[in-house]
Regions:
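Active-site neighborhood of HAD-like aspartate-dependent phosphohydrolases
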Residues: 1-47
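Acidic, Mg2+-coordinating phosphoryl-transfer loop and its flanking beta/alpha structural elements
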Residues: 123-163
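Substrate-recognition element of Asp-dependent hydrolases with the DxDx(T/V) motif
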Residues: 32, 36-69, 85-95, 134
């Protein structure tokens, strides 16, 4: 199985310091939906791994998160793509859970549920925590320059082997030529 793991906010959709709290606030980054479609049509299974601490903060509930994800699924399907699964951490940053990126628990859950090894699996995100989580499980870290990506690159400290790409469309073109 060809698997690619995608961060959500800042990678697929526009990020917000106020959090994405409703389907109406979920706005795709230009080209990202088509990139997912390209990956899907190229035989890749696309899985999302996202921190969603807005739940723990009381900014939105599970029903709202499900509605946001339903909108994402709908919009991706409209252009011929598919997101095979969404894995998320609902905990606050100070919760000490094992699933909040940069800890590797969320990615290990993906490996367990899908019965796959993550060595070399592309993990694409816009934040240091995304590429650190990828490196922790032996996945291939890619940093996109959308969302927080430019600031992340400028801050330095990327794990060895991290590749920097303009956006999700650029890496999709490479993985599914």
């Amino acid at each position: 199985m060809k698997l690619v793991i995608l961060d959500r906010d800042g990678t697929i959709n526009q990020d917000s310091d106020q959090y994405i709290k409703s389907p109406a606030e979920w706005k795709p980054i230009p080209g990202s939906l088509e990139a997912i479609a390209r990956l899907t049509q190229g035989g890749w299974r696309c899985v999302v791994a996202t921190n969603q601490s807005g739940i723990a903060r009381g900014l939105f509930d599970m029903a709202t998160l499900n509605a946001i994800h339903a909108e994402m699924h709908r919009r991706v399907a409209q252009v011929g793509g598919r997101i095979d699964a969404i894995f998320f951490c609902p905990h606050a940053a100070d919760s000490n859970c094992e699933c909040r990126k940069p800890k590797p628990g969320l990615l290990r859950e993906i490996a367990s549920r899908l019965d796959v090894e993550l060595a070399g699996v592309p993990m694409i995100g816009d934040a240091l925590r995304d590429v650190e989580a990828a490196a922790a499980v032996g996945a291939k870290p890619y940093l996109v320059l959308t969302g927080k990506g430019r600031k992340t690159r400028e801050a330095g400290g990327l794990p060895p082997g991290t590749e920097v790409v303009a956006d999700l469309a650029a890496i999709a073109a490479r993985l599914a030529p």
